[in-house]
Regions:
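Hydrophobic cores of alpha-helical transmembrane segments in multi-pass inner/ER membrane proteins
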Residues: 2-4, 57-67, 140-150
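Hydrophobic alpha-helical membrane-interfacial segments at the cytosolic entry of transmembrane helices
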Residues: 25-29, 82-92, 194-216
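Aromatic-anchored transmembrane helix interface
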Residues: 23-34, 44-68, 82, 87
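Transmembrane helix-loop junctions and nearby membrane-interface residues
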Residues: 5-12, 35-42, 95-105
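Transmembrane signal-anchor hairpin modules in multi-pass inner-membrane enzymes, especially those
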Residues: 1-36, 74-81, 153-157
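Membrane-interface loop/short-helix elements at transmembrane-helix boundaries
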Residues: 124, 221-242
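Juxtamembrane membrane-water interface segments that cap and precede transmembrane helices
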Residues: 114-131, 241-242
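Alpha-helical transmembrane segments of multi-pass inner-membrane proteins
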Residues: 80-108, 129-175, 180-192
Length: 242
């Protein structure tokens, strides 16, 4: 934001500052609508409002970053490059967290919105091993849109490494089952034969986890449908409905 302010006052931004007003209005609207359940139910659970406020703050910083560093001729290429870097970083920290490194788990949980205590230490905690202020369903949709964007970009430019598909599927799986189910649509729409090794690697990983570690609480929740297919119907996690 400081860099952007400097560029603006030095008149290095003759085209002005781009602000996606529609997206800004949507986030503010979500904050406003989140107040209604509090008023109706008389509760003091501000976790949802806190999440959207964090999103608003991050969105504003994101707009600032875009205008400061990406609003130029090569901006699109730079955005895609940094998104790829972000995917690699998220994959790395997510795996470290899943392996049980306490320092990484503490760091990842600190980046999330504050959620009800029942989620911490539960079979769903793995879904919080993401560097984000968003939780669960919204996070799955975010990763879904990110996958769709990167695949669409690659369909046109064909410059992204195929391993990126594997990494995206892995971090998307951490976010929840919504991503796992809906990502199939994006992959089918923008399918390339060179994605096949990454897709096979991911499928093998999922099958191995579901077959050999069905009792692991994180695996049981994330891969419940696959476990049911492999081990027979009737196996359910304690949080199937969520």
């Amino acid at each position: 934001m400081v860099v952007l302010a400097y560029q603006y006052f030095k008149k290095q931004k003759p085209q002005g500052i781009t602000v996606p007003v529609d997206s800004l209005v949507v986030i503010i609207g979500l904050i406003a609508f989140s107040v209604i359940p509090l008023l109706v139910n008389g509760t003091r659970d501000f976790s949802v409002i806190t999440m959207y406020v964090k999103e608003l703050i991050l969105f504003i910083f994101g707009v600032g970053l875009y205008n400061a560093f990406y609003a130029n001729v090569n901006g699109q290429q730079k955005v895609v490059r940094d998104l790829q870097l972000g995917v690699v970083v998220q994959f790395a920290v997510g795996v470290i967290g899943l392996l049980g490194a306490s320092f990484m788990i503490d760091f990842l949980l600190s980046t999330n919105a504050v959620l009800p205590a029942r989620f911490y230490g539960s079979e769903q905690e793995y879904r919080l091993y993401n560097i984000t202020a968003t939780a669960f369903f919204q996070l799955s949709l975010f990763y879904l849109m990110l996958l769709h964007f990167l695949l669409a970009y690659n369909a046109k430019h064909n410059t992204l490494p195929s391993i990126l598909v594997f990494l995206m599927l892995c971090i998307g799986l951490i976010s929840g089952r919504t991503f796992l189910l809906l990502s199939v649509v994006s992959i089918l729409v923008y399918f390339k034969w060179r994605y096949v090794p990454s897709l096979i690697a991911f499928a093998v990983l999922v099958l191995l986890l579901a077959y050999f570690l069905p009792e692991n609480p994180y695996v049981a929740h994330a891969l419940e449908p696959v476990i049911n297919l492999l081990h027979g119907e009737g196996f359910v996690s304690s949080s199937t409905d969520t």
